[in-house]
Amino acid sequence: MRIEKLLNAALLAGAVSAHTIMTSLVVDGTEYPPGHAVRIPSYNGPITDVTSNSVACNGPPNPTTPSSEIIMVRAGSTIQGKWRHTETDVIDPSHKGPVMAYLKKVDDAINDPGTGDGWFKIWEDGLHDDGTWAVDDLIAANGYQDIPIPPCLADGQYLLRAEIIALHGASQPGGAQLYMECAQIGVVGGSGTANPSTVAFPGAYKADDPGITVNIYWPPLEEYIIPGPDPFTC
């Protein structure tokens, strides 16, 4: 109940500002309760400083609530993260931008803060040829983000970092709004052959990256460079 009360407070606090939170995971057809193995913040505002430690798994000015759970996930499966602005909608449609997912292998998913090296991207979507964005697809899917888990992962505990970057105000440095939550998962059934290159949070993004500081309105974008590394493939 405490997690649900915090989530409701966070959603209500950000309702006017159209912010969003990844509240829960869906694994093998089971939608877990909000905050189950997900570090939910007490406020659903964005992180705008890409050099902040909070860019890893959220945090001040949005203190997160620890979770004592780990959700088991099969390598090679596709899970979902559920995003919510309020209980009934996802994010304001004006918040155009990319949607991504990262993993970090850790010894202790419950207590690892997520900061530092070890992160690798496993999925991304950005600007489409028809001018729509990944966020548009997320809204159309009622906030459910598909996240494919690579089949070649080593078994063990991981942090899963799901992220939206809203670019409606990104024409000036510090205007991009980063929304991210970390979930605690245990991977089983992987082949163990994965050897991905990794990046650090903070560190993977710079304020002047073309995918962070960008005017998405004028001139019309012909290409958008999604921040961070290319997604890892087996």
UniProtKB/Swiss-Prot annotation:
EC number(s) per entry: 1.14.99.56
Subcellular localization(s) per the UniProt record: Secreted
Pfam families noted in UniProt: AA9
Domain of life from the UniProt record: Eukaryota
Lipid metabolism is among the record's keywords: no
Signal peptide residues on this chain, from the entry's feature table: 1-18
A molecular function GO annotation: metal ion binding
InterPro entries (alphabetical): AA9 (IPR049892), AA9_LPMO (IPR005103)
Residues the entry annotates as binding O2: H168, Q177
Biotechnology: Lignocellulose is the most abundant polymeric composite on Earth and is a recalcitrant but promising renewable substrate for industrial biotechnology applications. Together with cellobiose dehydrogenases (CDHs) an enzymatic system capable of oxidative cellulose cleavage is formed, which increases the efficiency of cellulases and put LPMOs at focus of biofuel research.
Top class in the EC scheme: oxidoreductase
Bridged cysteine pairs (disulfide): C57-C182
Keywords: Carbohydrate metabolism, Cellulose degradation, Copper, Disulfide bond, Metal-binding, Monooxygenase, Oxidoreductase, Polysaccharide degradation, Secreted, Signal
Cofactor or coenzyme needed: Cu(2+)
Any one Gene Ontology cellular component term annotated for this protein: extracellular region
Catalytic activity from the UniProt record: [(1->4)-beta-D-glucosyl]n+m + reduced acceptor + O2 = 4-dehydro-beta-D-glucosyl-[(1->4)-beta-D-glucosyl]n-1 + [(1->4)-beta-D-glucosyl]m + acceptor + H2O
Keyword Disulfide bond: yes
CDD domains the record matches: LPMO_AA9 (cd21175)
Binding site for Cu(2+): H19, H95, Y179
A Gene Ontology biological process term: cellulose catabolic process
Cofactor details (free text): Binds 1 copper ion per subunit.
Record family assignment: Belongs to the polysaccharide monooxygenase AA9 family.
Physiological role: Lytic polysaccharide monooxygenase (LPMO) that depolymerizes crystalline and amorphous polysaccharides via the oxidation of scissile alpha- or beta-(1-4)-glycosidic bonds, yielding C1 or C4 oxidation products. Catalysis by LPMOs requires the reduction of the active-site copper from Cu(II) to Cu(I) by a reducing agent and H(2)O(2) or O(2) as a cosubstrate.
Protein's name in the database: AA9 family lytic polysaccharide monooxygenase D
Organism: Malbranchea cinnamomea (Thermophilic fungus)
